[in-house]
């Protein structure tokens, strides 16, 4: 299972405690009963979330759980840039051409029933997955390279935040792939085009209506532009503590990056990161959308090095406004005026 899933299978402990009959049934030699679905998720009615993650103590025959069915998504997808512990991720808007080989993990009881990153409810017996940069929702085929088994899952969550993991699957998906007991597996992840998937089966793709949007037709043109520009700011996403990535090691401040800049003119700051790589990535992206000089200014705050991504000097307030609009429309953050230091 994932590094955030550190507990071993907890079934023996449950059997020893002799709790409710529904739990004891998992320990008996008789075939386990299917759990009743409560509030849209699987599991017993008296489910109580454990403090540590692990496998469920109620059993379901995962061979009878169908794979996720790829559905076209005609509304907006969740692909906002977001920051985890100082590192900013820039999700893609289209998963259809995605291909990756790497390590998969899984997550279970601790997150069962909790909201996912796109607001859905995590069901450990659902066919879903978490990914750092795929759009939410999207669909991928995951193949276990050790045994050739494959599943289709719906990506609706963010994670895992460890450099050696490419995807986190639900417990059911991991069990169908044959690695729930070992915790991880080497997999191939392939994006799916839902329209093509349905066409290969000789059927038209179902029509999924987008969510209604608030009308802005009567709003002044400037207001409409601002509404579009501010639609997708960089998010600060705080995952559960068990998912946190390793802390960034202290680094030396590069004096060349902090070379003195002209004091005249106006300056914007778009982000501040503990991770210097995240700052460099944002700097590179900003350089592609604005003609204003982009630089990194590193300072120490509360015994931590922060790498601030800034623009300037900018000659006028009008130019500042245009630059801010360009950055917002590109979904690269919310630039704010700062004093040069």
Curated annotation (Swiss-Prot):
A lipid is attached at residue 27 (S-diacylglycerol cysteine). Changing residue 131 to A: Strong decrease in transglycosylase activity. GO terms for cellular component: cell outer membrane; plasma membrane. One of its GO terms (biological process) is cell wall organization. A lipid is attached at residue 27 (N-palmitoyl cysteine). It is a lipid-anchor. It is found in: Cell membrane. Disruption phenotype: Mutants form chains of short, fat cells when grown in low osmotic strength media. The keyword Lyase applies. Residues 260-341 form the SPOR domain. Keywords: Cell membrane, Cell wall biogenesis/degradation, Lipoprotein, Lyase, Membrane, Palmitate, Signal. It comes from the Bacteria. InterPro entries: RlpA, RlpA-like_DPBB, RlpA-like_sf, RplA, SPOR-like_dom, SPOR-like_sf. Its EC number is 4.2.2.-. One of its GO terms (molecular function) is peptidoglycan binding. Residues 1-26 form the signal peptide. Pfam families: DPBB_1, SPOR. The keyword Lyase applies. Lytic transglycosylase with a strong preference for naked glycan strands that lack stem peptides. Required for efficient separation of daughter cells and maintenance of rod shape. HAMAP family: RlpA. The SPOR domain is important for normal localization, but not for cell division or rod shape. Belongs to the RlpA family. This is Endolytic peptidoglycan transglycosylase RlpA.
């Amino acid at each position: 299972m994932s590094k955030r899933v550190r507990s071993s299978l907890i079934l023996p402990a449950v059997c020893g405690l002799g709790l409710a009959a529904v739990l004891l049934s998992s320990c008996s030699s008789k075939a386990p009963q299917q759990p009743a679905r409560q509030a849209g998720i699987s599991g017993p009615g008296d489910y109580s979330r454990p403090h540590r993650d692990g496998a469920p103590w109620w059993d379901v025959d995962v061979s009878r759980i169908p794979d996720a069915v790829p559905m076209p998504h005609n509304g907006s997808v969740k692909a906002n840039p977001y920051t985890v512990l100082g590192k900013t991720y820039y999700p893609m808007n289209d998963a259809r051409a995605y291909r990756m080989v790497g390590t998969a993990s899984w997550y279970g009881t601790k997150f069962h029933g909790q909201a996912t990153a796109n607001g859905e409810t995590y069901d450990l017996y659902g066919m879903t997955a978490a990914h750092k940069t795929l759009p939410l929702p999207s669909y991928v085929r995951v193949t276990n390279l050790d045994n050739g088994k494959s599943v289709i899952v719906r990506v609706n969550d963010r994670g895992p935040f460890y450099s050696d993991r490419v995807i986190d699957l639900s417990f059911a998906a991991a069990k169908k792939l044959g690695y729930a007991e070992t915790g991880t597996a080497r997999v191939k992840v392939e994006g799916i085009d839902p329209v093509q998937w349905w066409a290969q089966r000789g059927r038209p793709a179902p029509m999924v209506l987008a969510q209604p949007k608030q009308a802005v037709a009567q709003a002044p043109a400037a207001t409409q532009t601002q509404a579009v520009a501010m639609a997708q700011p960089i998010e600060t996403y705080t995952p559960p503590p068990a998912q946190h990535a390793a802390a960034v090691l202290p680094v030396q401040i590069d004096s060349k990056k902090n070379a003195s800049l002209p004091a005249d003119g106006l300056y914007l700051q778009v982000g501040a990161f503990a991770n210097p790589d995240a700052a460099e990535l944002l700097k590179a992206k900003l350089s592609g959308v604005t003609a204003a000089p982009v630089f990194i200014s590193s300072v120490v705050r509360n015994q931590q090095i922060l790498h601030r991504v800034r623009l300037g000097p900018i000659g006028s307030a009008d130019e500042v406004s245009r630059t801010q609009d360009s950055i917002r429309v590109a979904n690269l953050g919310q630039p704010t005026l700062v004093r040069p230091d």
